Every structure is written in C-alpha cells, then in structure tokens.
Amino acid sequence: MVKAVAVRGDSKISGTVTFEQADANAPTTVSWNITGHDANAERAFHVHQFGDNTNGCTSAGPHFNPFGKEHGAPEDENRHVGDLGNFKTDAEGNAVGSKQDKLIKLIGAESVLGRTLVIHAGTDDLGRSEHPESKKTGNAGARPACGVIGIAA
C-alpha cells in the first residue's frame, strides 16, 4: 500500500487530497476534504506535470499527460492522466468525497508522486465545449490552490 497527500497552496482554500494505491495494478483512491471554496459549486481539480510551486500554482505546468491525450472526463478513455474532473461544494464552500481512478498511479513510471495537485477556480467542462481551452484544460480557470503530492506517513 502506497499513500500520498497534497495540501493547500497560498489562498483561502485549504484542505487535503489523499491518494492510496494497494499495488501497481490496483486503481487509486482519491479522497478530498477541502474548505473555503465557492458555495454550492462544482470546481475542478487536476494533477499537473511539475512539483514546482516556486511561482505559485502557475509553475506546476500543464495537466500530467504522459500518453499525449486530449483533455476529458475521469471516465473517458481519451483523457489526461491528471484529469480528475470536478468536486461539489456545500453551502459553506466545503467539499468532502472520494473516487477511484484507474489512471492515477502512485507506483510505476507514470506515478503522480512529486507532481502538483491543483484546485481550480472554475468548473471543468470535461473537454466537451467549443471553448479553445476545452480540449487542453477543460476551461477550468485560475489556480487558487495547489500542493505537491508527497509520500504520506
């Protein structure tokens, strides 16, 4: 069992996103507990290429995409590895949840360890709109919070 965690960046949004994978062939469970976001909203989160936050969340680079795919929904065959989709917030702007993901890995060559988890200001359109950013970023907006994914105790 490998466990990893990413914590907030520099904004009012805080919380943790944890990753757990039993073995190299198992799906990864992604769990989140996020506070301080917009109330009653769907907000995007993705794993980005670099574990570099020297210039805030901007230096995390594009979505983690080792297979050269277009942006998509977590359940799509054609998607970036880092495409986690959206989470829903409650009336206070908090979100708690989990999902399993077959492409997110903590073990192997395409591991997300050392990369950055970014929480976006907008909703991921899942690559389904006509917006020029849709097939690249999901048109998910700014990056108000992020954290490097590191090995958890």
UniProtKB/Swiss-Prot annotation:
Substrate binds at residue 143. SUPFAM superfamilies: Cu,Zn superoxide dismutase-like. Residues 61-80, 124-143 are annotated as: Disordered. Its main location: cytoplasm. The keyword Mitochondrion does not apply. GO terms for molecular function: copper ion binding; oxidoreductase activity, acting on a sulfur group of donors, oxygen as acceptor; superoxide dismutase activity. Its cofactor is Cu cation; Zn(2+). Cu cation binds at residues 46, 48, 63, 120. Binds 1 copper ion per subunit. It is found in: Cytoplasm. Belongs to the Cu-Zn superoxide dismutase family. Destroys radicals which are normally produced within the cells and which are toxic to biological systems. PANTHER family: SUPEROXIDE DISMUTASE CU-ZN -RELATED. Homodimer. This is Superoxide dismutase [Cu-Zn]. It comes from Aspergillus flavus. The gene is sodC.
